[in-house]
Amino acid sequence: LSIADNMFMGRELRKPGIMGKWFRQLDRPAMEKFAREKLSELGLMTIQNINQAVETLSGGQRQGVAVARAAAFGSKVVILDEPTAALGVKESRRVLELIRDVRARGIPIILISHNMPHVFEVADRIHIHRLGSRLCVIRPQDYSMSDAVAFMTGAKVPEAAEVAA
């Protein structure tokens, strides 16, 4: 699929009039323009050709397209599961910047990650789980990464205030 096709999957725009209504022809120019605008808004200017196949993109660019797709259509929340896994340092940086940009637009993000530096860099709150259950909720400015890891491993027990959160 092209980048534009990927962004519009399940939300394709039809041509106006009889061609779209009866013959169900897609309005590709409108889809491409919208996709280009949304990628540009999020600073994904490294993607030159909107008709480029997604599988030819780098891992960071693919994640960027996925984030742009979620942000472009007024999602109430964006859920990202290990968005920086298997990415290089530069690509991870770019994905974290995209997360900040989307969050700045007022869209809540649920980030599932084992990469503690990334979590502490972008999170407002961190839900720590241990043995399949939520153990506590902490704010990154109040705790260190070492504290968070200690909670996860059971080396440290959170205070009652964090557990109740």
What is each stretch, according to the model?
Residues 1-165:
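Glycine-rich phosphate-binding loops of nucleotide-dependent enzymes
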